[in-house]
Amino acid sequence: MPSTRKLFVTTALPYANGPFHLGHLMEYIQADIWVRFQRMQGHEVNFVGADDTHGAPIMIAAEKAGKTPQQFVADIAAGRKPYLDGFHLSFDNWHSTDAPENHELARQIYRDLRDRADGSLIERRSIEQFFDPGKSMFLPDRYIVGECPRCHAKEQYGDNCEQCGSVYAPAELIDPVSALSGAKPELRSSEHFFFKLSDPRCVEFLQRWTQDGKLQPEVANKVREWFGLRSNPDGSCSEGLDDWDISRDAPYFGIEIPDAPGKYFYVWLDAPVGYLAALKNLLEKRGQNYDAYMADPALEQYHFIGKDIVTFHTLFWPAMLHLSGRKTPDNVFVHGFLTINGEKMSKSRGTGLDPLKYLSLGMNAEWLRYYLATKLSARNEDMDLGTEDFMVRVNSDLIGKYVNIASRAAGFLTKRFAGRLTSDFGAAGLALLADLHGARDTIAQWYQAREFGKATREIMLLADKVNAYVDRNKPWELAKDAANGQALHQVCSVLINAFATLTRYLSPVLPALARAAQDFVGQDMQRWDAGGAVQAIAPYQHLMQRVTPEQLAALFQPPAAAQIAAAGAQEPGGLALAPGIGIDDFDRVDLRVALIVDCAAVAGSTKLLRLTLDIGEGRQRQVFSGIASACQPADLIGKHTVMVANLAPRRLKFGVSEGMVLAASHGDEKANPGIYLLAPGPGAKPGMRVR
């Protein structure tokens, strides 16, 4: 690896239908810490982001708001800066997928795919789609609802059932209706464009690319399953990858396909191209040549994403780039989902964290940056923000262990020694500082590997050593006797130098505090290898305050009843409430606590898991559930869930399903991704009825 590297780093593009939430910020902070560390190493980094602005949901939301789609996404973009600045996110550029650069690059990539290999990578096919005659538009699958043709659950989407996990074509839905108008849609034929992901050139490339270290092991293992058997809408099975429908029909807010009037790129084709467009826009503003930059063989390309969009970034995106003759990513770094106190974020229940409210309450952005860093690892794992844990970690680690090192020594140095430090550290002081300096490479390795939790733990262990030195030498006792002046000077000088070293190690996580500390100790905190002893300090200013219980209470205070009522008018969970039922109707559904005895992936399906359940009836049941995107089989074994025990068995192509487990998800999965398997409280036993 060259001593000076050239890196192009991105985060997933947020959909431009609302403000940032904590999940966005977690990803941006994760990437920002890594980027700041790379810059401290002297590497050249271009770190970019953009709004994902296209698609039917944007077009429909804009219409409801009485705006053009362009005005709607511009208004969303105007609200990004307070988040980016407030949480010290060091993006070099924030752009939009509706920008000219993205239109140009998306069309060029398409042309290159179309024109390579005798045009065999792009294929036109006539398909049947549902058309809303009232809206005069073809309906995306997510805007068609009806009865599942397999389990007969009501109000299921047009492509898969969230109750039984079945995958089907929209035309198979029973009694379909348009979610936009409530009208009965009509089946009409339309010519669509397909990228032939099943082409042997795609398959062979992706099998190599996804298994050569570019993905975390657990992600690579998941992707490997997708090259096996796949299920078709007609119930048959075939082997390999499905071709990808990359077009949508007008009216559509997006990028029109070259030489195909009225046809637009599907949003997931042009969205990742937005990474390149944001970079191109940045380089052009600097007077640099984009093509020359991307052609440099030394360039490294990295994407930070959530686990809900792995398919697009590990199959479609690298295949598009490779087969259009472009550089492919060096790594795709996947993270899990975030909960608060073990619950999915919800403003109405007081379990949401509004980032701007956090800042408006005077809460330090770097408290959150540090806390998330302590939880982040290189694995694709979910993480939880516990409010009590948050307060304890910030107050104990950052204030008690770290900042207090400087505050304990600064006053004595300023009052007794005019802020000057001695270079005589004594044997114990030299040994302590040597320990701190000796950890530099280990901490750097943890940062490089995105093991921020391990890096922060290592730093706090060093802080413990410094505080043990304080307790042994007791500078407050030394200060009581003028005869101890030399010893006091020595101890306080060691502490300030230790504080400077710890600050440099924490600088990727706490950039604002590091800048303030830089002014305090007179050392460069932006270079990892900066060294030398601190010569003098400026008068000490408070660097960080403690978190208070009152701040946390205000942050997580649920909205007033009137606000909750207003929010309810916007459809809770993204779906209108179902018609009311009587207690007799509910009593017919037998819900039981079930122990998950075993769980495994289903060959040929990317959505289903096969669960073996015990509800205490003397036998075990097999149930299929469409939760594979959110749950690892090994994590579920031994846990309890809730199942519908009296649902008639139904035969799927993978086997017979003898019930249904309960899971929750938002109506708009793109804006609010995640599937959450329900679990009973502690003490519940298999077979207990849920009433």
Curated annotation (Swiss-Prot):
GO terms for molecular function: ATP binding; metal ion binding; methionine-tRNA ligase activity; tRNA binding. The keyword Zinc applies. It comes from Verminephrobacter eiseniae (strain EF01-2). This is Methionine--tRNA ligase. The gene is metG. Its cofactor is Zn(2+). ATP binds at K347. Zn(2+) binds at C148, C151, C161, C164. Binds 1 zinc ion per subunit. GO terms for biological process: methionyl-tRNA aminoacylation. It is found in: Cytoplasm. It catalyses: tRNA(Met) + L-methionine + ATP = L-methionyl-tRNA(Met) + AMP + diphosphate.
